[in-house]
Amino acid sequence: MAEQLSPGKAVDQVCTFLFKKPGRKGAAGRRKRPACDPEPGESGSSSDEGCTVVRPEKKRVTHNPMIQKTRDSGKQKAAYGDLSSEEEEENEPESLGVVYKSTRSAKPVGPEDMGATAVYELDTEKERDAQAIFERSQKIQEELRGKEDDKIYRGINNYQKYMKPKDTSMGNASSGMVRKGPIRAPEHLRATVRWDYQPDICKDYKETGFCGFGDSCKFLHDRSDYKHGWQIERELDEGRYGVYEDENYEVGSDDEEIPFKCFICRQSFQNPVVTKCRHYFCESCALQHFRTTPRCYVCDQQTNGVFNPAKELIAKLEKHRATGEGGASDLPEDPDEDAIPIT
Protein backbone atom coordinates (compact mmCIF):
# COMPACT_ATOMS: atom_id res chain seq x y z
CA MET A 1 0.00 0.00 0.00
CA ALA A 2 2.95 2.22 0.56
CA GLU A 3 4.09 1.77 -3.01
CA GLN A 4 2.94 4.24 -5.58
CA LEU A 5 0.95 2.67 -8.37
CA SER A 6 1.20 3.60 -11.97
CA PRO A 7 -1.71 5.34 -13.59
CA GLY A 8 -2.64 2.29 -15.78
CA LYS A 9 -2.55 -0.16 -12.92
CA ALA A 10 -4.44 2.18 -10.62
CA VAL A 11 -7.47 2.14 -12.86
CA ASP A 12 -7.61 -1.67 -12.90
CA GLN A 13 -7.04 -2.20 -9.22
CA VAL A 14 -9.15 0.59 -7.66
CA CYS A 15 -12.58 -0.60 -6.32
CA THR A 16 -15.49 1.78 -6.79
CA PHE A 17 -18.29 1.85 -4.19
CA LEU A 18 -21.77 2.95 -5.28
CA PHE A 19 -24.19 4.32 -2.66
CA LYS A 20 -27.88 4.10 -3.63
CA LYS A 21 -30.15 6.69 -2.13
CA PRO A 22 -33.41 5.33 -0.72
CA GLY A 23 -36.55 6.41 -2.60
CA ARG A 24 -39.25 8.55 -1.09
CA LYS A 25 -41.94 6.60 0.70
CA GLY A 26 -44.40 9.49 1.04
CA ALA A 27 -45.54 9.39 -2.57
CA ALA A 28 -48.72 7.49 -1.75
CA GLY A 29 -50.88 10.55 -2.26
CA ARG A 30 -49.63 11.19 -5.77
CA ARG A 31 -51.90 10.56 -8.70
CA LYS A 32 -50.83 7.50 -10.60
CA ARG A 33 -50.57 7.61 -14.34
CA PRO A 34 -52.31 4.89 -16.32
CA ALA A 35 -49.91 2.33 -17.68
CA CYS A 36 -49.61 2.59 -21.45
CA ASP A 37 -48.03 -0.23 -23.43
CA PRO A 38 -47.32 0.60 -27.07
CA GLU A 39 -48.09 -2.01 -29.66
CA PRO A 40 -45.08 -3.83 -31.17
CA GLY A 41 -45.67 -2.50 -34.72
CA GLU A 42 -45.90 1.12 -33.70
CA SER A 43 -43.34 3.47 -32.32
CA GLY A 44 -43.69 4.86 -28.88
CA SER A 45 -43.03 8.39 -30.07
CA SER A 46 -46.35 8.71 -31.90
CA SER A 47 -48.54 11.06 -29.92
CA ASP A 48 -51.56 10.79 -32.24
CA GLU A 49 -52.44 7.22 -31.25
CA GLY A 50 -54.05 6.49 -27.86
CA CYS A 51 -52.58 4.23 -25.20
CA THR A 52 -54.07 1.00 -23.83
CA VAL A 53 -55.14 1.02 -20.17
CA VAL A 54 -54.24 -2.12 -18.28
CA ARG A 55 -56.56 -2.72 -15.34
CA PRO A 56 -55.52 -5.25 -12.74
CA GLU A 57 -57.99 -8.05 -12.17
CA LYS A 58 -59.65 -8.21 -8.79
CA LYS A 59 -58.56 -11.22 -6.85
CA ARG A 60 -61.22 -13.49 -5.56
CA VAL A 61 -60.87 -13.67 -1.80
CA THR A 62 -62.00 -16.78 -0.03
CA HIS A 63 -64.69 -16.03 2.54
CA ASN A 64 -63.35 -16.24 6.05
CA PRO A 65 -65.90 -16.34 8.88
CA MET A 66 -63.34 -14.86 11.27
CA ILE A 67 -63.12 -11.68 9.22
CA GLN A 68 -66.12 -9.37 9.26
CA LYS A 69 -66.69 -6.21 7.29
CA THR A 70 -69.53 -3.91 6.41
CA ARG A 71 -68.82 -3.88 2.68
CA ASP A 72 -70.99 -6.21 0.59
CA SER A 73 -73.09 -6.96 3.67
CA GLY A 74 -76.25 -7.13 1.58
CA LYS A 75 -75.17 -10.34 -0.12
CA GLN A 76 -76.24 -13.45 1.69
CA LYS A 77 -74.05 -16.47 1.21
CA ALA A 78 -75.37 -19.94 1.89
CA ALA A 79 -72.05 -21.51 2.85
CA TYR A 80 -68.53 -20.38 3.57
CA GLY A 81 -66.36 -20.66 0.48
CA ASP A 82 -66.38 -19.73 -3.15
CA LEU A 83 -69.62 -19.70 -5.05
CA SER A 84 -70.22 -19.64 -8.74
CA SER A 85 -71.77 -16.62 -10.39
CA GLU A 86 -75.05 -18.47 -10.93
CA GLU A 87 -75.28 -19.46 -7.27
CA GLU A 88 -74.51 -15.90 -6.21
CA GLU A 89 -77.33 -14.57 -8.37
CA GLU A 90 -79.74 -17.09 -6.87
CA ASN A 91 -78.76 -16.21 -3.29
CA GLU A 92 -79.04 -12.42 -3.78
CA PRO A 93 -82.04 -11.05 -1.84
CA GLU A 94 -84.93 -9.77 -3.86
CA SER A 95 -85.94 -6.11 -3.63
CA LEU A 96 -88.32 -5.55 -0.73
CA GLY A 97 -91.78 -4.25 -1.52
CA VAL A 98 -94.91 -3.70 0.56
CA VAL A 99 -98.29 -3.99 -1.07
CA TYR A 100 -101.54 -3.01 0.67
CA LYS A 101 -104.90 -4.16 -0.52
CA SER A 102 -107.57 -1.49 -0.45
CA THR A 103 -110.78 -2.20 1.43
CA ARG A 104 -112.75 0.12 -0.88
CA SER A 105 -114.16 1.91 2.15
CA ALA A 106 -113.85 5.49 3.37
CA LYS A 107 -114.04 4.48 7.03
CA PRO A 108 -110.84 4.77 9.10
CA VAL A 109 -108.93 1.67 10.07
CA GLY A 110 -109.81 0.41 13.53
CA PRO A 111 -112.97 0.48 15.60
CA GLU A 112 -115.77 2.77 14.55
CA ASP A 113 -115.72 4.69 17.82
CA MET A 114 -111.96 5.33 17.44
CA GLY A 115 -111.21 3.58 20.70
CA ALA A 116 -113.62 5.63 22.82
CA THR A 117 -115.00 2.46 24.41
CA ALA A 118 -111.64 0.78 24.91
CA VAL A 119 -111.41 -1.08 28.21
CA TYR A 120 -108.42 -1.08 30.52
CA GLU A 121 -107.64 -4.78 30.68
CA LEU A 122 -105.07 -4.69 33.49
CA ASP A 123 -107.66 -4.12 36.22
CA THR A 124 -109.49 -6.92 37.98
CA GLU A 125 -112.46 -8.35 36.12
CA LYS A 126 -115.83 -6.86 36.96
CA GLU A 127 -117.12 -10.18 38.25
CA ARG A 128 -114.29 -10.49 40.76
CA ASP A 129 -113.44 -6.98 41.95
CA ALA A 130 -114.38 -5.40 45.28
CA GLN A 131 -117.41 -3.65 43.80
CA ALA A 132 -118.91 -6.96 42.59
CA ILE A 133 -118.26 -8.60 45.98
CA PHE A 134 -119.98 -5.70 47.75
CA GLU A 135 -123.01 -5.86 45.46
CA ARG A 136 -123.39 -9.61 45.98
CA SER A 137 -123.14 -9.12 49.73
CA GLN A 138 -125.85 -6.45 49.65
CA LYS A 139 -128.11 -8.72 47.61
CA ILE A 140 -127.63 -11.67 49.98
CA GLN A 141 -128.35 -9.48 53.01
CA GLU A 142 -131.64 -8.39 51.42
CA GLU A 143 -132.63 -12.01 50.86
CA LEU A 144 -131.74 -13.12 54.41
CA ARG A 145 -133.36 -10.17 56.18
CA GLY A 146 -136.20 -11.37 58.43
CA LYS A 147 -135.36 -15.07 58.08
CA GLU A 148 -133.87 -17.51 60.56
CA ASP A 149 -130.31 -18.68 60.34
CA ASP A 150 -130.18 -21.68 57.98
CA LYS A 151 -126.65 -22.69 59.09
CA ILE A 152 -125.22 -22.25 55.58
CA TYR A 153 -121.77 -20.73 55.17
CA ARG A 154 -121.76 -18.21 52.32
CA GLY A 155 -118.27 -16.80 52.67
CA ILE A 156 -116.48 -14.33 54.90
CA ASN A 157 -118.22 -11.36 53.28
CA ASN A 158 -121.75 -12.75 53.48
CA TYR A 159 -122.43 -13.31 57.16
CA GLN A 160 -126.02 -12.55 58.08
CA LYS A 161 -126.46 -9.12 59.67
CA TYR A 162 -129.39 -8.72 62.04
CA MET A 163 -129.03 -4.93 62.31
CA LYS A 164 -129.03 -2.73 59.26
CA PRO A 165 -126.35 -0.03 59.54
CA LYS A 166 -127.67 3.48 59.09
CA ASP A 167 -126.10 6.91 58.82
CA THR A 168 -122.76 5.34 57.98
CA SER A 169 -120.76 5.02 54.80
CA MET A 170 -121.40 1.28 54.71
CA GLY A 171 -125.10 1.67 55.28
CA ASN A 172 -125.57 4.40 52.70
CA ALA A 173 -123.16 2.93 50.18
CA SER A 174 -125.70 1.36 47.88
CA SER A 175 -123.35 1.93 44.95
CA GLY A 176 -120.19 1.09 46.83
CA MET A 177 -118.44 4.27 45.62
CA VAL A 178 -118.30 5.95 49.03
CA ARG A 179 -117.24 3.00 51.12
CA LYS A 180 -113.74 2.12 52.24
CA GLY A 181 -111.53 -0.07 50.11
CA PRO A 182 -110.66 -0.12 46.42
CA ILE A 183 -113.01 1.64 44.03
CA ARG A 184 -113.71 0.37 40.55
CA ALA A 185 -111.87 2.38 37.95
CA PRO A 186 -113.71 3.93 35.00
CA GLU A 187 -114.53 1.34 32.37
CA HIS A 188 -113.54 3.46 29.39
CA LEU A 189 -110.26 5.29 29.12
CA ARG A 190 -111.79 8.57 27.96
CA ALA A 191 -114.13 9.00 30.91
CA THR A 192 -111.75 11.23 32.89
CA VAL A 193 -112.77 14.90 32.96
CA ARG A 194 -111.10 17.77 34.80
CA TRP A 195 -113.32 20.73 35.60
CA ASP A 196 -111.78 24.18 35.42
CA TYR A 197 -112.92 25.47 38.81
CA GLN A 198 -109.45 26.30 40.14
CA PRO A 199 -108.27 29.75 39.08
CA ASP A 200 -105.15 29.41 41.29
CA ILE A 201 -105.39 33.00 42.53
CA CYS A 202 -104.41 33.81 46.10
CA LYS A 203 -107.71 34.52 47.84
CA ASP A 204 -106.14 36.40 50.75
CA TYR A 205 -104.19 38.72 48.47
CA LYS A 206 -107.20 39.31 46.22
CA GLU A 207 -109.47 40.29 49.09
CA THR A 208 -107.06 42.06 51.46
CA GLY A 209 -103.92 42.80 49.44
CA PHE A 210 -101.79 40.88 51.95
CA CYS A 211 -100.57 37.27 52.00
CA GLY A 212 -98.76 35.62 54.88
CA PHE A 213 -96.71 33.40 52.58
CA GLY A 214 -95.17 36.37 50.80
CA ASP A 215 -93.13 35.63 47.69
CA SER A 216 -93.17 31.90 48.44
CA CYS A 217 -96.93 31.68 47.77
CA LYS A 218 -97.58 29.40 44.81
CA PHE A 219 -100.81 31.18 43.84
CA LEU A 220 -101.09 34.30 41.72
CA HIS A 221 -100.99 37.59 43.60
CA ASP A 222 -103.47 39.65 41.62
CA ARG A 223 -106.51 41.59 42.74
CA SER A 224 -108.23 41.56 39.35
CA ASP A 225 -111.42 39.70 38.54
CA TYR A 226 -111.12 36.61 36.36
CA LYS A 227 -113.77 34.53 34.65
CA HIS A 228 -114.04 30.79 35.10
CA GLY A 229 -114.11 28.39 32.20
CA TRP A 230 -117.85 27.81 32.49
CA GLN A 231 -118.46 31.57 32.31
CA ILE A 232 -116.43 31.83 29.11
CA GLU A 233 -118.31 28.88 27.62
CA ARG A 234 -121.63 30.51 28.49
CA GLU A 235 -120.58 33.71 26.74
CA LEU A 236 -119.52 31.68 23.70
CA ASP A 237 -122.90 29.97 23.57
CA GLU A 238 -124.73 33.29 23.90
CA GLY A 239 -122.46 35.00 21.36
CA ARG A 240 -121.23 37.62 23.82
CA TYR A 241 -117.61 36.47 24.06
CA GLY A 242 -115.12 39.05 22.87
CA VAL A 243 -117.73 41.80 22.50
CA TYR A 244 -116.38 44.89 24.21
CA GLU A 245 -118.96 47.16 25.73
CA ASP A 246 -117.92 50.76 26.15
CA GLU A 247 -120.04 51.27 29.23
CA ASN A 248 -117.98 48.69 31.09
CA TYR A 249 -114.94 50.94 30.88
CA GLU A 250 -116.57 54.32 31.47
CA VAL A 251 -115.52 56.12 34.62
CA GLY A 252 -118.43 57.68 36.44
CA SER A 253 -118.26 61.40 37.08
CA ASP A 254 -119.09 63.14 40.31
CA ASP A 255 -122.21 64.63 38.75
CA GLU A 256 -123.90 61.24 38.66
CA GLU A 257 -123.69 61.03 42.44
CA ILE A 258 -125.56 64.30 42.90
CA PRO A 259 -129.11 63.57 44.15
CA PHE A 260 -132.16 65.16 42.58
CA LYS A 261 -134.11 65.51 45.86
CA CYS A 262 -133.30 66.97 49.22
CA PHE A 263 -132.51 64.35 51.88
CA ILE A 264 -134.48 66.22 54.56
CA CYS A 265 -137.67 67.40 52.89
CA ARG A 266 -137.67 64.86 50.03
CA GLN A 267 -138.66 67.65 47.65
CA SER A 268 -136.94 69.45 44.80
CA PHE A 269 -134.04 71.65 45.80
CA GLN A 270 -134.62 75.29 46.71
CA ASN A 271 -131.38 77.25 46.88
CA PRO A 272 -129.28 74.07 47.26
CA VAL A 273 -126.19 74.11 49.48
CA VAL A 274 -123.44 71.53 50.00
CA THR A 275 -121.54 70.56 53.14
CA LYS A 276 -117.88 69.58 53.54
CA CYS A 277 -118.88 65.90 53.36
CA ARG A 278 -120.43 66.45 49.89
CA HIS A 279 -124.09 66.16 50.90
CA TYR A 280 -126.71 68.43 49.35
CA PHE A 281 -129.67 70.06 51.09
CA CYS A 282 -132.05 72.94 50.63
CA GLU A 283 -130.80 76.11 52.29
CA SER A 284 -133.81 76.37 54.59
CA CYS A 285 -133.66 72.66 55.47
CA ALA A 286 -129.94 72.85 56.28
CA LEU A 287 -130.36 75.90 58.56
CA GLN A 288 -133.34 74.36 60.33
CA HIS A 289 -131.42 71.14 60.94
CA PHE A 290 -128.38 73.12 62.14
CA ARG A 291 -130.50 74.64 64.93
CA THR A 292 -131.03 71.11 66.23
CA THR A 293 -127.50 69.70 65.76
CA PRO A 294 -124.37 70.92 63.96
CA ARG A 295 -123.77 67.46 62.48
CA CYS A 296 -124.66 66.33 58.95
CA TYR A 297 -128.11 64.86 58.47
CA VAL A 298 -126.78 61.95 56.32
CA CYS A 299 -123.37 60.90 57.64
CA ASP A 300 -123.49 62.53 61.09
CA GLN A 301 -120.17 64.33 60.57
CA GLN A 302 -119.37 67.75 62.06
CA THR A 303 -120.31 70.54 59.63
CA ASN A 304 -119.23 73.48 61.81
CA GLY A 305 -122.05 75.48 60.25
CA VAL A 306 -120.33 75.66 56.83
CA PHE A 307 -122.82 75.50 53.93
CA ASN A 308 -121.52 76.47 50.49
CA PRO A 309 -123.66 77.15 47.41
CA ALA A 310 -124.00 73.98 45.31
CA LYS A 311 -122.93 75.44 41.96
CA GLU A 312 -122.52 71.99 40.33
CA LEU A 313 -126.02 70.95 41.32
CA ILE A 314 -127.49 74.27 40.13
CA ALA A 315 -125.78 73.90 36.73
CA LYS A 316 -127.04 70.34 36.39
CA LEU A 317 -130.61 71.29 37.27
CA GLU A 318 -130.57 74.14 34.76
CA LYS A 319 -129.22 71.82 32.09
CA HIS A 320 -132.02 69.33 32.64
CA ARG A 321 -134.63 72.10 32.63
CA ALA A 322 -133.30 73.28 29.27
CA THR A 323 -133.59 69.82 27.74
CA GLY A 324 -137.28 69.78 28.61
CA GLU A 325 -138.72 66.29 28.53
CA GLY A 326 -135.35 64.61 28.79
CA GLY A 327 -134.64 66.51 31.94
CA ALA A 328 -138.08 65.68 33.32
CA SER A 329 -137.45 61.96 32.79
CA ASP A 330 -134.08 62.15 34.52
CA LEU A 331 -135.46 64.23 37.37
CA PRO A 332 -138.87 62.81 38.26
CA GLU A 333 -141.09 65.02 40.31
CA ASP A 334 -144.38 64.53 42.04
CA PRO A 335 -147.38 65.15 39.71
CA ASP A 336 -149.16 67.44 42.18
CA GLU A 337 -146.05 69.51 42.81
CA ASP A 338 -145.51 72.68 40.85
CA ALA A 339 -142.14 73.61 39.48
CA ILE A 340 -140.18 75.76 41.89
CA PRO A 341 -137.88 78.30 40.30
CA ILE A 342 -134.24 78.28 41.31
CA THR A 343 -132.88 81.56 42.58
UniProtKB/Swiss-Prot annotation:
Zinc finger residue ranges, C3H1-type: 196-224
Modified residues (N-acetylalanine): 2
UniProt entry keywords in alphabetical sequence: Acetylation, DNA damage, DNA repair, Metal-binding, mRNA processing, mRNA splicing, Nucleus, Phosphoprotein, Spliceosome, Transferase, Ubl conjugation pathway, Zinc, Zinc-finger
Residue numbers carrying Phosphoserine: 6, 84-85, 253
Tissue expression from the record: Ubiquitous.
Outcome following mutation: residue 277 to A: Loss of E3 ubiquitin ligase activity
Record protein name field: E3 ubiquitin-protein ligase RNF113A
Source species taxonomy: Eukaryota, Metazoa, Chordata, Craniata, Vertebrata
